Regions:
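Signature of Gram-negative outer-membrane beta-barrel scaffolds
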Residues: 1-69, 95-96
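Outer-membrane beta-barrel signature, preferentially recognizing the C-terminal barrel domain
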Residues: 1-4, 53, 82-141, 157-184, ...
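Short loop/turn motifs that connect adjacent beta-strands in outer-membrane beta-barrel proteins
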Residues: 15-17, 71, 129, 186-195, ...
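Transmembrane beta-strands of outer-membrane beta-barrel proteins
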Residues: 20-24, 74-76, 132-134, 177, ...
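Transmembrane beta-strands of outer-membrane beta-barrel pores
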Residues: 26-32, 78-84, 91-93, 138-142, ...
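Outer-membrane beta-barrel translocator domains and adjoining extracellular loop/strand segments
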Residues: 32-41, 87-93, 100-101, 145-151, ...
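Gram-negative outer-membrane beta-barrel transporters
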Residues: 138-140, 158-256
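C-terminal beta-signal and adjacent terminal beta-strands/loops
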Residues: 195, 251-259, 280-331
C-alpha cells in the first residue's frame, strides 16, 4: 500500500476572540497485493494472482474556536476522515480448515470507510487547576466494514459449516454526548489540594442504514458494530512531592462484535468494569529513582462474548488480579 498526500491550510483570527483553521487534504492510495490459499488437510499453500487497485480522497476540515473569556471556550468543527481496510482483510487469500469444515477468505474489493464528522463542545476552566466540559458529536459513516459470518454456505461448489469474509456492510449515522470533569479538592479545604478527581462519560446512539449483509438486507434498527452505547472513566488521585497514587475505573456497555446470518447468531462483547490502582514514589536530583507498584483488574472482570442474548455465553475467560512492582533509575 502506497499513500501519497498533500494539503493546504488556512488560519485566520477574527478580532481577538475567534480563531479559524481550515484545510483540505488530498490522499492517493495505490494497492498491489497477492495472497496465498492454505489447506490444513494437505498443509500446503498456493499463491494467488497479483491484483491492483487505487483511489483518491479529498478530506476537508474546518475548526472554529471562540474564546468567550479567559475561562470559557467554545469549539466547533467539521472534518472528513478516512479509515482504510486492514491488510489482512484486503489480501485475496483463502484459509480452509477441513477439520471444522470452515473457510475464511479475504476481500480485495473492500472500499475505505469514510466518516463525516460534526463536533461542538464547551469548556470551562476553573481558577484553580481543573475544568468541566460538555460536547455533542454527529458522524455519518459510509461503507463500514464487518466480518460477514454465514453458516452452511456453499463456496465454489463446496458447502462449509462456517464461511467468513470481511465486507462493506452499509452506512451508519451516529450521534452522542460527552461530559468530562477534572478538579483538585483544594476549593473544599486547602489540605485537600493534593487530592483530585477526573471523570468522563459518553453516550452514543447509532443506527445502520442500507445494510448490505447477505440474508439480512431488509433489517432495521441495528446498532453500529463495535460501538458501545455507554462508556465512562473515573480516576481519584493523590499527588504530593514525589508521591503519586491513583485509583481508576473504566466501564463500557456491551456491543455487537461480529455479525451472524441472523440476530440469533450475532456475537456480542459483554459489558466490562475495570478497576486498577497504581502508586509511585520518585526521589533524587542527579540520579532519579522511582519505586512503583500497580494492581490491575481488581474486580476480576472476565473477557466474555455471548450470542444473541446475555444468557448464551460463547466464551468467558478470567485472568484474576495482575500485580507488578519495580524500580526505575534515570540519570
Amino acid at each position: 500500500e502506497t499513500v501519497s498526500s498533500g494539503y493546504v491550510r488556512f488560519d485566520h483570527k477574527f478580532a481577538s476572540d475567534i480563531n479559524l483553521m481550515a484545510g483540505l487534504r488530498m490522499e492517493h492510495t495505490s494497492l498491489r497485493y497477492t495472497g496465498r490459499n492454505y489447506d490444513d488437510e494437505t498443509d500446503k499453500t498456493t499463491k494467488t494472482g497479483r491484483m491492483t487497485n487505487s483511489y483518491v480522497n479529498f478530506l476537508p476540515s474546518i475548526l472554529v474556536k471562540w474564546d468567550v473569556n479567559d475561562d470559557f471556550k467554545i469549539r466547533g468543527s467539521y472534518t472528513q476522515t478516512l479509515s482504510r481496510p486492514k491488510y489482512s482483510a484486503l489480501v485475496p487469500s483463502v484459509n480452509i480448515n477441513r477439520g471444522d469444515n470452515e473457510i475464511k477468505i479475504g476481500n480485495s474489493d473492500l472500499k475505505p470507510t469514510i466518516s463525516y464528522n460534526f463536533d461542538l463542545s464547551a469548556d470551562y476552566y476553573f481558577k484553580s487547576v481543573g475544568l468541566v466540559s460538555a460536547g455533542f458529536f454527529y458522524k455519518k459513516i459510509d461503507d463500514f466494514i464487518v466480518d460477514q459470518v454465514l453458516t452452511n454456505y456453499e463456496y465454489q461448489g463446496t458447502e462449509y459449516t462456517r464461511f467468513t469474509q470481511p465486507k462493506n456492510a452499509g452506512n451508519a449515522n451516529l450521534w452522542g454526548l460527552e461530559f468530562s470533569y477534572q478538579r483538585d479538592f483544594g476549593f473544599i479545604a486547602p489540605a485537600l489540594k493534593y487530592v483530585g478527581f477526573y471523570g468522563t462519560y459518553t453516550y452514543t446512539h447509532s443506527r445502520v442504514e442500507d445494510f448490505n449483509f447477505e440474508g439480512r438486507e431488509n433489517e432495521s434498527g441495528l446498532s453500529l458494530p463495535g460501538s458501545p452505547e455507554h462508556t465512562a472513566n473515573a480516576s481519584l488521585y493523590f499527588e504530593k512531592g514525589g508521591l503519586n497514587v491513583r485509583l481508576s475505573y473504566n466501564f463500557a456497555s456491551d456491543f455487537i462484535d461480529e455479525m451472524g446470518p441472523s440476530t440469533f447468531y450475532d456475537r456480542y462483547y459483554d459489558a466490562v468494569n475495570y478497576m486498577d490502582v497504581n502508586a509511585s514514589y520518585t526521589f533524587g536530583k542527579k540520579v532519579k529513582m522511582t519505586f512503583y507498584a500497580e494492581a490491575n483488574n481488581l474486580l476480576n472482570q472476565p473477557l466474555r462474548y455471548y450470542q444473541g442474548t446475555k444468557d448464551r455465553t460463547m466464551q468467558a475467560e478470567y485472568y484474576g488480579v495482575r500485580m507488578n512492582a519495580g524500580l526505575k533509575i534515570s540519570f
